[in-house]
């Protein structure tokens, strides 16, 4: 994410402030309060995002708990508990794959704030990479300390404007089939929840960053409704997998463990017949 946006100075200042916050120590209550105090979105949206964060926390807790022998059953229970609040939970089926890059405000955040976009996607990469690392640790001792490796790579990615060349910040949205394939193999539903949450977060930031939008609240509510709807499966599973993998492992932040020194893809998602033509008006 080395490109410059129109608000580079503001982005750099914001990243410095965010890094200071991230290095602090916070309780679970502090984290939940941060969602409630968010003035950018309404209470319903905050609750959806908070519930998603708690699901991700519960999922990681299952995999690091040595006393839980049947991880798959525990994950299935966590998924069922998460879905127990239908209004504030996203679907466990893939939504329309190209919605991320074809909705009217698509790429708004990445275009206006490329450094912060990479910052957000790096956070999402860590969610998936940490889960993949701890699952691998449970499967094979050769992957011991994988979570520490993933965490070190995370700090390398956000330690500078563009990240280190060996472990650059993601230039594509990280998705479970690419970054956490073992999670996807063990629980497609859990992986889909995380991917739907991360896509929704990206869509929300696109809407918030897009200039001269008068109905941001309505657009965000519509996006949340789309992702929390359980009535229809908007895309086929294979289309979802193709979309996830077309982003490339390297471009999505690289593997949690192991090495991948360059992109294994020669085209991005947007270049593979997934191009969104965005015309942004002058920022106010």
Model regions and ranges:
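Polar/charged low-complexity regulatory segments
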Residues: 1-284
